[in-house]
Amino acid sequence: TMKKTLTLLLLTFSQFYFSQTIAEARNQSIGQTVTINGVATNGGELGAIRYIQDATAALPAYGNNLSSIQRGDSVSVTGVMFEFSGLLELSPTTSYTILGQGTMPEPLLIPITSANEDLEAQLVRFDNVSFVQSGFFSSGSSTVQITDGTNTLDVRVNGSTNIDGSEIPSGPISIVGLVGQFNANHQLIPRDLEDIF
């Protein structure tokens, strides 16, 4: 009947075109197409990837078509669930819309031992940590470590930030960044020098 057809069309439409929370999207299977709404917590400083966060979780979206998305933009992004070296992400992204200026989430203050799967891709902050290395960050992309005196965590310095080549701060610092993953290791990905203070 017409009513059943209309109901089926509405169900199909809602399944494909209405976004879900990012926490719900993270539970979808690899290969599933999803649409998420959230705030971009980074812009071009990390290259083609954009980290999108809402009140429930965060998810990176990867694609050269995202270059106009800037930090703080409220966006809707559609893409395919994919896992790259342990990091759950939307790749490829098939479409996006910039909805306007969003409200940047406050970095969640956590101990470095809490940088794990539960907070993957979210904006976090560590206080009273120190870099294990001294001297200067390598030119280009590199990985260094921070310590709280007992535990260590990898910090991935992306070569497209203004961090590479700069002096590594000595002594206790605070650092903000995105929780990433590469294979079995979780890592912190700062966006620029202002994330290290």
What residue spans do the PLM features occupy?
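Bacterial Sec-dependent N-terminal signal peptides
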Residues: 1-23
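OB-fold single-stranded nucleic acid-binding module
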Residues: 20-197
